[in-house]
């Protein structure tokens, strides 16, 4: 859900556009190493060199680099001389020792006019400068001590809604009906989820299929064979609904899923297979049917803030008029908001020695994915990260942030999650959205390459390489439907259970999904598989994107493609930690180049020299792409993941890509 745009960073004086730009042109491009070095975010204590090209024979009287964030500094730019008949100016600045976002623009006096070069108006803070623009270029300055766990950049993640993944043999999960709750238990594993609408328009989400932690444990060999190394569970704690984003008790695994011992056993066996487990933390709200609120009286007459204003949990919530008028999440009365800055709540969730976040990491999990992270106060996030890292420096904190996380605007405030003090990384919805737009011909390759390059510019490498690169999720229609161009959004919600793709739609959707898959497994960050996507599951929006895994009924071609892409990534370290550059050879072909050069990877760690190029062609026609040997670290031979050999002729490669096909090539 989009809820804001980054600020312009125009502290101080605003300058009006002048009319003298036809003869006076300034140029600066943040993605050009000649204009900005180093590229990307900069650690505290670092230096940045910024250059400006003046395309006019008459040099300006004065030329300044203006930098600000709260305070403002103006740096005179010194002339370096002519390059290709154009005057080059330069300023070198220290970024200081404070993690923050810096904003900058260029200004000069010309023929009595004040001339400004600012950022393009796409709110990225990156790209080619625009004369007269009031937008600011962004420079991210992050804590030099900031690091993220290596397993995040190396991993392949798999997201599981436990109720919909697998019924464990030898368990009686279907017998664990909720006390006093009207729930529906599906006997047929392959049925569609039910849509049971309440008066407020919400789905009751009270139908269950009986998937449990034991079922996940029994499928660990399958997940290992798929190439997975990180398991991310949607919430598993006690809750009334099947999705469990309405927590009832943070200290208990929902009995329909198992218990604490079942989770510990799963974590231990997963670890033995080289897999980690991450939990979903829902800390901005609880369920109304919780120990802490108890609106329905499940826990007794005088337990919980709704039942007793003297309850120890009363201060967790904001009552406008007790008991029925209270703040709730996005208007849902079933989800009372908590006051995250309440001292008792902070101690319970974060600070006590056996707090919620500490307890479950000690029990063998490897960290947390935070639901609606952009709705949590920044001090809360900082303390959460500190507490998790105190238990295990190798544990991770991922956040649900839907936009560029370096300058997210939420509730009127600009928040940066990339400075090293809050999150390790976030869900990469911008990548997902950009690739969908490209594959559906809504944006051309150049626009998408620019978007992805801007993200890479704004994010510190530890953050960028730890991104959760998702294709599907529980909050979106199945990716197969999206890429088939038929996600059911144009039909009534009550009819979506019966919605099916046609044979032709399924074929085109599968081809596009395989292109997206290839690209996702070729870029920095953890590629994430939403359970069932690898099996060809289709479905409209919630609850139909939350169907059960089709054991024994998988789309074997799709499954084989997922396995192949995971094996490719796991077998080539350059796809995990190599430097990254996005390319757009033509409007219909998007590419990414990964490199290890001079015996080092993107983090400066020892690595074998390597180069990989991935190209995906969204058009139905064959396209020929030309690459120079210089593009691929001087290589003269490229070998694709399916065994094709490409040889340079005259210092260039000619690569034919069939319609709706892709290729990944490795330098030899």
Where are the regions that the model predicts?
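Carbohydrate-binding surface patches
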Residues: 583-632
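C-terminal beta-strand-rich structural cap/linker in extracellular carbohydrate-active enzymes
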Residues: 56, 649-668
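Substrate-binding/active-site clefts of carbohydrate-active enzymes
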Residues: 161-230, 236-363, 384-390, 407
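Aromatic/acidic polysaccharide-binding cleft in carbohydrate-active enzymes
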Residues: 163, 411-412, 425, 468-501, ...
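Conserved, mostly hydrophobic/aromatic
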Residues: 52, 160, 223, 233, ...
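Beta-strand-rich binding/interaction modules
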Residues: 59-70, 102-104, 622-645
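Glycan-association/targeting regions that enable binding to alpha-glucans and other polysaccharides
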Residues: 2-154, 158-159
């Amino acid at each position: 859900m989009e809820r804001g745009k980054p600020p312009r960073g125009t502290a101080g004086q605003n300058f009006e556009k002048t009319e003298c730009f036809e003869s006076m042109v300034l140029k600066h491009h943040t993605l050009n190493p000649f204009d900005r070095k180093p590229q990307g975010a900069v650690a505290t204590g670092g230096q940045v060199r910024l250059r400006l090209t003046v395309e006019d024979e008459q040099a300006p009287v004065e030329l300044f680099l203006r930098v600000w964030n709260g305070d403002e500094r103006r740096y005179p730019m010194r002339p370096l001389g002519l390059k290709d008949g154009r005057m080059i100016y330069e300023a070198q600045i220290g970024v200081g020792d404070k993690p923050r976002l810096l904003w900058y623009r260029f200004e000069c006096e010309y023929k009595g006019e004040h001339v400004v070069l600012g950022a393009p108006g796409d709110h990225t803070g990156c790209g080619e400068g625009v004369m007269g623009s009031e937008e600011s270029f962004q420079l991210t300055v992050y804590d030099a001590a900031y690091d993220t766990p290596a397993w995040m950049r190396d991993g392949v993640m798999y997201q599981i809604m436990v109720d919909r993944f697998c019924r464990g043999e030898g368990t009686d999960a279907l017998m664990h009906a909720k006390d006093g709750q009207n729930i529906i238990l599906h006997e047929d594993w392959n049925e569609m989820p039910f849509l049971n609408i309440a008066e407020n328009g919400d789905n009751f989400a009270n139908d269950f299929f009986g998937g449990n932690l034991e079922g996940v444990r029994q499928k660990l060999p399958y997940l290992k064979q798929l190439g997975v190394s990180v398991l991310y569970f949607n919430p598993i704690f006690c809750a009334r609904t099947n999705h469990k984003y309405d927590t009832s008790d943070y200290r208990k695994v929902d009995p329909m899923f198992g218990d604490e011992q079942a989770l510990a056993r799963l974590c231990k066996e997963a670890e033995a297979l080289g897999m980690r487990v991450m939990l979903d933390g829902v800390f901005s709200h609880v369920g109304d049917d919780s120990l802490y609120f108890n609106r329905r009286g499940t826990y007794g007459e005088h337990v919980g803030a709704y039942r007793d204003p003297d309850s120890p949990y009363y201060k967790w919530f904001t009552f406008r008029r007790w008991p029925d008028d209270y703040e709730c999440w996005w208007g849902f009365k079933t989800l009372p908001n908590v006051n995250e800055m309440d001292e008792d709540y902070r101690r319970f969730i974060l600070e006590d020695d056996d707090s919620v976040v500490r307890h479950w990491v000690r029990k063998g999990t490897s960290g947390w994915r935070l639901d609606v992270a952009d709705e949590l106060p920044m001090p809360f996030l900082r303390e959460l990260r500190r507490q998790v890292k105190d238990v295990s420096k190798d544990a991770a904190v991922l956040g649900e942030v839907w936009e560029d996380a370096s300058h997210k605007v939420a509730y009127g405030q600009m928040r940066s999650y990339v400075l090293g003090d809050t999150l390790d990384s976030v869900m990469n919805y911008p990548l997902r959205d950009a690739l969908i737009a490209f594959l559906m011909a809504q944006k051309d390759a150049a626009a998408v390459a620019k978007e992805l390059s801007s993200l890479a510019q704004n994010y510190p490498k530890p953050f960028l390489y730890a991104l959760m690169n998702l294709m599907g999720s529980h909050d979106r229609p199945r990716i197969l439907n999206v890429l088939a161009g038929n996600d059911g959004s144009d039909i009534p919600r009550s009819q979506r259970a019966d919605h099916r793709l046609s044979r032709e739609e399924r074929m085109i959707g599968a081809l596009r999904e395989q292109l997206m898959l290839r690209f996702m497994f070729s870029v920095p960050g953890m590629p994430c598989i939403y359970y069932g996507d690898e099996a060809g599951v289709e479905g409209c929006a919630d609850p139909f994107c939350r169907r059960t895994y089709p054991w024994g009924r998988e789309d074997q071609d799709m499954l084989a493609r997922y396995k192949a892409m995971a094996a490719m990534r796991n077998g080539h370290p350059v796809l995990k930690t190599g430097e990254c550059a996005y390319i757009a050879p033509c409007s219909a072909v998007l590419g990414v180049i990964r490199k290890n050069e001079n015996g080092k990877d993107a983090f400066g760690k020892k690595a074998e020299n390597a180069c990989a190029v991935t190209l995906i062609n969204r058009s139905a026609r064959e396209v020929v792409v030309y690459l120079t040997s210089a593009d691929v670290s001087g290589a003269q031979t490229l070998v694709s993941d399916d065994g094709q050999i490409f040889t340079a002729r005259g210092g260039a490669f000619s690569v034919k890509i069939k319609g709706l096909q892709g290729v990944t090539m490795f330098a030899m």
